[in-house]
Amino acid sequence: MNIVEQMKDVLKQEIKEAVMKAGLAEESEIPEVVLEVPKDKSHGDYSTNMAMQLARIAKKAPRNIAEEIVASFDKGKASIDKLDIAGPGFINFYMNNQYLTKLIPAVLEAGEAYGETNIGGGERVQVEFVSANPTGNLHLGHARGAAVGDSLCNVLEKAGYEVSREYYINDAGNQINNLALSVEARYFQALGKDKPMPEDGYHGEDIKEIGQKLADEFGDRFVHEEESERLAFFREYGLKYELGKLREDLENFRVPFDVWYSETSLYQNGKIDQALEALREKGHIYEEDGATWFRSTAFGDDKDRVLIKKDGSYTYLLPDIAYHKDKLDRGFQKLINVWGADHHGYIPRMKAAIEALGYDKETLEVEIIQLVHLYKNGEKMKMSKRTGKAVTMRDLIDEVGLDAVRYFFAMRSADTHMDFDLDLAVSTSNENPVYYAQYAHARICSMLRQGEEKGISFEGNLDLTKIGSEKEYDLLKVIGSFPEAVADAAEKRIPHRITNYIFELASVLHSFYNAEKVLDPADEEKSRARLSLMKATQITLNNALKLIGVSAPEKM
């Protein structure tokens, strides 16, 4: 807990003490103290609606209650300069903000660890995200899911959760058979032989590349081979190629995974039969019309679900249940799936399966990623100008740069449709949020370099009483709220809370820079103190940018 959080706790306790001292309520009757930061700075540093909350208990008008709380309040302990009452009974607190300077040495000492909290308490969380079929390039929805999923993992780790990042490889379904048939057609075509593409084939450039690669490497060897053997080889070859490309793309996007989990392994290791048997033992399976059904309506689903069809083939749901059972068997306490919007209707049946297996259905959380629309020159863009095909993640990174893609995708709530303005993403103006944030970091680094060049160091003992202007305190307040922003983003699963924080920190930094001189030739101690404030800001901004996978340049 940093100094800002400590002081808020002291203030909350002193408000309770004042309530009891005024005889307005017993300690057990006092509601939780809520402290808000007023939008208008002239209304103080914090405000509470405690008087309104107590009106029913104290049987008095909120304004009168507020007056009694103020009269009984001990200003000394909570570092308060003054209090006043606004409107129907809001109490505003004006802090003696010198206490904020204690943040500077604390942030400098913490370094990369600044912002860490332990609200997660080491809870084991598995986040499964992206999990795109290994049959083509990653599209914009995958890119958004990758950015959101990775940022969420970073935030959860910073907040004290033990996180495992997992990619589920859909390598067992019909789409892999179609991949093999598509590769076969492109292989024959690369050899100049006629072979039509399958009806549900994949027409991407990558499939042509695989066909050409096979032709170059093996010549016409497979033309004369047994079809089943040829397709088995093409299946493995194509899968390996596509997976290699996916891994490379995600690595370049700064999205690491701890586990790449193969769907095929569920079949090989008997996990599907085990899951089916577990549900059967608990009485949640029945046979009807030659099919095997899961009684999911018993757990809130709108209809029962087929697991094994009449022809003996599995529906998608059965291996998915087996996969989620395996996740739980591995000891994860919370499962977070980051899914595309087309999976929304799938949530109730998966939660039903979790509950049917004997777990709390809330163990599974699903974050939905909504669609992305690209705009250029104010017009919606459907196809890549370069390829004439749907825009891929690679295309987008080539167009606007990696940092812009990561920042923009982390910037909005995942469950809202996103309009991605390509022109804004490459502009070098304050309207571009990633430029605004990175420029703030580069600006701080420039100030630190200037101090170094002039031989002014912030190492050693500092006179932090030299820090005292309104702009400096504004900066310290935002720096001090970083651990709270991390905790909030983690608890609510909203990584975009961090981009909001970054924008706020960059704003107060630019405002400080425009109003104050960091290096004062007439006062070296003041310069040293301000350089230490700049270093604390740089550490905080760098740590925040790292959470969303965005670089922090030292020069721009």
Curated annotation (Swiss-Prot):
GO cellular component: a single term: cytoplasm
Cross-referenced PANTHER family: ARGININE--TRNA LIGASE, CYTOPLASMIC, ARGINYL-TRNA SYNTHETASE
Keywords: Aminoacyl-tRNA synthetase, ATP-binding, Cytoplasm, Ligase, Nucleotide-binding, Protein biosynthesis
Subcellular location: Cytoplasm
Gene3D superfamilies tied to this protein: Arginyl tRNA synthetase N-terminal domain, HUPs, Isoleucyl-tRNA Synthetase, Domain 1
Entry's Gene Ontology BP terms: arginyl-tRNA aminoacylation
Native organism: Bacillus licheniformis (strain ATCC 14580 / DSM 13 / JCM 2505 / CCUG 7422 / NBRC 12200 / NCIMB 9375 / NCTC 10341 / NRRL NRS-1264 / Gibson 46)
Molecular-function GO terms, alphabetical: arginine-tRNA ligase activity; ATP binding
E.C. numbers: 6.1.1.19
The protein, known as: Arginine--tRNA ligase
Motif ('HIGH' region): 132-142
A Pfam family matched in the record: Arg_tRNA_synt_N
Family: Belongs to the class-I aminoacyl-tRNA synthetase family.
Catalytic activity annotation: tRNA(Arg) + L-arginine + ATP = L-arginyl-tRNA(Arg) + AMP + diphosphate
Assembly description: Monomer.
